Amino acid sequence: MQILKWQIIMIYRIGVIGQFNLTFELAWKALQEILKMHGADGAATGSPREILQLGYKLSFVDDAAVWLLMLKKRNTSVHIYNEQEVDEMILLIRDSFIPAFVGLEKTLR
């Protein structure tokens, strides 16, 4: 029974990471669309990194370092192999990434 409970908890935790990946994809693509609507140079063809940097430059995102860390973590999250890495990712999502998503949502309204 204890092993089953641990497995269920891990499934939920890995699901949180999967939802972060999806949310990040939607966020940077929404930012790209907003930048295109504002006529920002490079918005139409930019990579996620370029879009995030441009969004920071034009004050759509508050903290470029957090967004670039999100990009890095999104790219490496498929290679999380142990519980400590899952713990670290969950804490980053809770403490840094969710507030950044909320900030972008407020800015885009």
What are these regions (language model features)?
Residues 1-109:
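Solvent-exposed interaction patches of small proteins and small membrane subunits
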